[in-house]
């Protein structure tokens, strides 16, 4: 009995120690929105890391550059607490990471879980990137680059901090009602990580302007990821699967696998659920369901790649989507946004960063074609759409074995399906103003005869002809 009591006491002491709270003001944080609190917050995190404690804050606004959450630490932001990102790029240290599909050095995020285990970022508080200064610098650079044939370099040369980075880590949790707003670049980037849960985040990036490249949640060459209860309003892809770009992505060859995305709403974005355009490492065993997209989302489900990306997608399951006034229900493009996707260094430019060379490294044609197959899409309800389908695969590597079931779509136009092999439709209700254009009717089975027209190929619109703001949503 005495031994049992001693053991119970030891367990209670260990539990108490592991649950110890560390309050940031005790380490010098002011929370006045003016004083730079980076060092004080990091000291608090480092102290908590010694025994797996929780970092807490008094209500206030804590101006900060990059902070790094350590293994075993919970960063808890209660209601009334805001971590406000510094507008000085120098407050975000440059470090190795992956950006838009290539490994390179880039400013750290505002909140980082970098090569850690069992770290948590939760609470009903706010992480605010205050990103407009970075958005404006991007647009200035891009408008000078575009006429010089350097659209592809804009996103890499205009360095901007992400809001949260989970990099090469495992056992990470983010959520609990967090408000993530005004990110300078991507909002929540999960890269090279395993066993990550995002549960309960509100993302608002269209405040005070339209933030370019302000993706919602990017799952990048990672495995065993759950995203649920997300409420997203951004100016690029909302819920996005990525796996590397072109030669560098093919070199790394890390897939995104075993991902579940569910019970979320997308209010404004370039697309609701997106695969790509960074497809090089491939996607396997992805499921997304109970997703709602609204009028501010041009595309409900988007697959995008390019002739130099390569990669694959297999066993992808998308179901129980509700699309309300979302213009395009399903878009698949294997030649997405050419001015961004294909890096060509003008011959008159002799001095350029090393990553330009990485971006412009040629990829053999056969290796560059992404191959999507064994995709199941079912229980999609779309009302008020402009176009049902915009599907453009490769003639040499068609989109294979797509099964679409239980579709209930009302759209002004049927759109088109090109370079598809062994597509089957079943139990579909289509109310279309114009039929779906097919090149080869025998490759697509099960569509009502009245909803199909076989004929000449429909040429997709070149997004480079659109405004800068519209290009990224094409």
Predicted regions mapped to residue ranges:
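Bacterial N-terminal signal peptides
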Residues: 7-14
């Amino acid at each position: 009995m005495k031994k049992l009591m001693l053991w119970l006491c030891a367990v209670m002491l260990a539990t108490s120690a592991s649950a110890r709270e560390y309050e940031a003001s005790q380490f010098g944080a002011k929370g006045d929105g003016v004083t730079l609190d980076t060092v004080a917050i990091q000291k608090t995190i480092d102290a908590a890391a010694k025994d797996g404690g929780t970092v807490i804050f008094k209500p206030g606004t804590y101006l900060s550059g990059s902070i790094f959450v350590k293994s075993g630490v919970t960063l808890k932001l209660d209601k009334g607490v805001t971590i406000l990102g510094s507008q000085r790029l120098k407050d975000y240290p440059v470090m190795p990471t992956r950006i838009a599909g290539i490994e390179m050095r880039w400013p750290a995020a505002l909140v980082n879980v970098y090569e850690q285990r069992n770290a948590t970022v939760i609470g009903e508080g706010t992480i605010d990137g205050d990103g407009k200064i970075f958005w404006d610098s991007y647009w200035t650079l891009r408008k000078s680059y575009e006429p010089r044939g350097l659209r592809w370099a804009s996103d890499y040369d205009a360095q901007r901090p992400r809001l949260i980075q989970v990099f090469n880590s495992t056992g990470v949790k983010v959520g609990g009602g967090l408000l993530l707003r005004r990110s300078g670049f991507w909002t929540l980037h999960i890269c090279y990580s395993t066993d990550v849960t995002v549960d309960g985040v509100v993302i608002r990036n269209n405040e005070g302007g339209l933030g370019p490249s302000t993706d919602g949640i990017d799952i990048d060459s990672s495995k065993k990821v759950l995203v649920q209860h997300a409420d997203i309003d951004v100016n690029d892809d909302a819920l996005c699967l990525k796996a590397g770009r072109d030669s560098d992505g093919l070199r790394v060859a890390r897939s995104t696998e075993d991902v579940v995305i569910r019970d979320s709403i997308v209010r404004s974005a370039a697309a609701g659920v997106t695969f790509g355009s960074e497809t090089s490492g491939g996607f396997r065993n992805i499921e997304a369901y109970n997703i709602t997209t609204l009028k501010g989302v041009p595309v409900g489900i988007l697959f995008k790649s390019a002739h130099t990306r390569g990669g694959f997608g297999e066993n992808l399951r998308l179901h129980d989507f509700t699309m309300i006034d979302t213009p395009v229900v399903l878009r698949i493009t294997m030649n997405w946004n050419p001015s961004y996707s294909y890096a060509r260094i003008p011959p008159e430019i002799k001095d350029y960063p090393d990553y330009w060379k990485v971006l412009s490294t040629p990829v053999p044609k056969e290796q560059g074609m992404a191959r999507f197959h064994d995709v199941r899409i079912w229980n999609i309800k779309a009302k008020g759409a402009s176009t049902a389908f915009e599907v453009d695969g490769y003639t040499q590597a068609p989109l294979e074995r797509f099964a679409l079931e239980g579709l209930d779509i009302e759209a002004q136009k049927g759109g088109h399906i090109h370079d598809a092999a062994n597509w089957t439709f079943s139990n579909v209700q289509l109310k279309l103003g114009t039929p779906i254009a097919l090149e080869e009717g025998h490759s697509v089975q099960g569509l009502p005869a009245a909803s199909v027209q076989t004929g000449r190929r429909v040429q997709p619109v070149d997004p480079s002809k659109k405004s800068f703001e519209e290009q990224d949503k094409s």
